Amino acid sequence: MAKFRYKFESIKKIKETFEKKIQKEISLIDLEIEKQNGLLESLAEEKNKSRNSLSGRSFIKISELQFQGEVQNLLGLREKKILSEIANLRKIKETRMLELEQKTKEHKIFETLEEKHYEDFLLVQNQIEQKEIDEIASKKFAREA
């Protein structure tokens, strides 16, 4: 029996490679989002610590109050920057997810096509084998007669 060779095997492997590449990109984006969320949490803690540093005192200088206001503004700007970065990463992740969905569909199509070609191959091989068996049987019958 002949060996089955799928004529689109190289294309299928390339599609698998692209699919794995996109999966890796998505996981890297997830890691970056987690990192940004961690930065956001630490920034929130820093904001609270900054606010609480003044609340325990009974006497506060105006310069300290102005300084704390500037610190709060700066922390707010950093928070906005991190939030916009997270939104941007989520947007990129969404596009990558759509690409992954498309690549998965393409991969599945090629797998289905391979199964169909394999079934056709088996059918042809069975027909060839049946012809050989019939030939052997007719030769054996001809010798006996």
Question: For the regions a protein language model found, what residue spans apply to each?
Answer:
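Charge-rich amphipathic alpha-helical interaction elements
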Residues: 1-145
